[in-house]
């Protein structure tokens, strides 16, 4: 039963916003979102706590805060309109909630791209037990 639940969650991610966010990350960084950012520092991945470990982790912290301000839809599942144009990510559509989610993802992907030099492999698979200090959005 647990395996079916995991497969269902993965399929939702493939169809929903997490897949779109991953495409934005790849576009701005050239890296796989799943392999490079899914479990990095204290904030990159599901959930988050503590103080961001570096500028890359801070991108995830700011992204989590941005998702926390979105009202009217589930940011992790919302499918939105966007395009890649001349090196930029452009959010589209008339739905304000979908557009807000897209903007959160766009800003985070740009942040990752601007902070590629701070990415430190020692923070990959970083233990959450080391994320003890607190920081507010």
From Swiss-Prot:
It is found in: Secreted. The active site is at residues 63, 105. It catalyses: a 1,2-diacyl-sn-glycero-3-phosphocholine + H2O = a 1-acyl-sn-glycero-3-phosphocholine + a fatty acid + H(+). Its main location: secreted. Ca(2+) binds at residues 43, 45, 47, 64. Its cofactor is Ca(2+). Keywords: Blood coagulation cascade inhibiting toxin, Disulfide bond, Hemorrhagic toxin, Hemostasis impairing toxin, Hydrolase, Lipid degradation, Lipid metabolism, Metal-binding, Platelet aggregation inhibiting toxin, Secreted, Signal, Toxin. Residues 1-16 form the signal peptide. It is an enzyme of class 3 (hydrolase). Disulfide bonds join 42-131, 44-60, 59-111, 65-137, 66-104, 73-97, 91-102. It comes from the Eukaryota. Binds 1 Ca(2+) ion. Its EC number is 3.1.1.4. GO terms for molecular function: calcium ion binding; calcium-dependent phospholipase A2 activity; phospholipid binding; toxin activity. Snake venom phospholipase A2 that causes internal bleeding, shows very strong anticoagulant activities and inhibits ADP-induced platelet aggregation. Shows very low cytotoxicity. Is not able (or very weakly) to suppress the acetylcholine (ACh)-evoked current mediated by alpha-7-similar nAChRs in L.stagnalis neurons (IC(50)>30 uM) and to compete with alpha-bungarotoxin for binding to muscle- and alpha-7 neuronal nAChR types, as well as to AChBPs. This is Acidic phospholipase A2 Vur-PL2B. It comes from Vipera renardi (Steppe viper). The lineage of its organism: Eukaryota, Metazoa, Chordata, Craniata, Vertebrata.
